[in-house]
Design a protein with these regions (language model features):
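Charged, glycine-rich active-site and insertion segments that engage polyanionic ligands
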Residues: 1-92, 99, 103-159
Length: 159
């Protein structure tokens, strides 16, 4: 499931067959989250921790879109001592940035990103994406997770 990627519409149909009775909006969210990767989409539906982390990434993006510094700090605070969780947040946040940047160019409509899309341009989303790789490298080579989380928040506010 993790290797095969398919169009999101096909992913939704596959998820509907695997999870009968699931709300179609949740199936759509899972397909968008997975980006055509069935394993990621399935984990979104099966694991509360995955949905919670995705919600935290969405909260971070919303806080940045609205220019609320306290909300940015609040969204990052749970990860100050959680290196693995922060790396997962970065992955989800990066996925949101990619979808956000693609929206004006024919990306899949996403009701959760629609209000944010008018506030964060594709260039700004790309600039945020560029910061993520550097933060991942810092986490890999340095153990200072709280300082790295703070640095990431500061860098995002400058963009």
């Amino acid at each position: 499931l993790e290797i095969l990627e398919i169009p999101e519409t096909q992913a939704e149909r596959w998820l509907e067959a695997q999870f009968p009775g699931t709300d179609p909006k949740e199936l759509h969210r899972a397909a968008l989250y997975g980006g055509g990767n069935l394993g990621r989409s399935r984990s979104f539906l099966e694991e509360e921790a995955v949905r919670r982390r995705y919600g935290q990434a969405l909260s971070l993006l919303s806080a940045l879109a609205n220019g609320k510094e306290f909300d940015v700090v609040s969204a990052l605070a749970p990860f100050e001592g959680d290196k693995a969780g922060f790396l997962q947040l970065l992955q989800d946040f990066d996925g949101l940035l990619g979808r956000l940047a693609a929206l004006p160019y024919g990306g899949t409509a996403d009701p959760e990103l629609a209000p944010i899309a008018s506030k964060i341009s594709p260039l700004r989303a790309a600039a945020m994406h560029d910061r993520i790789d550097g933060i991942r490298q810092r986490l890999f080579y340095n153990a200072g997770c709280p300082l790295t989380v703070a640095l990431f928040g500061a860098q995002l506010k400058e963009i």
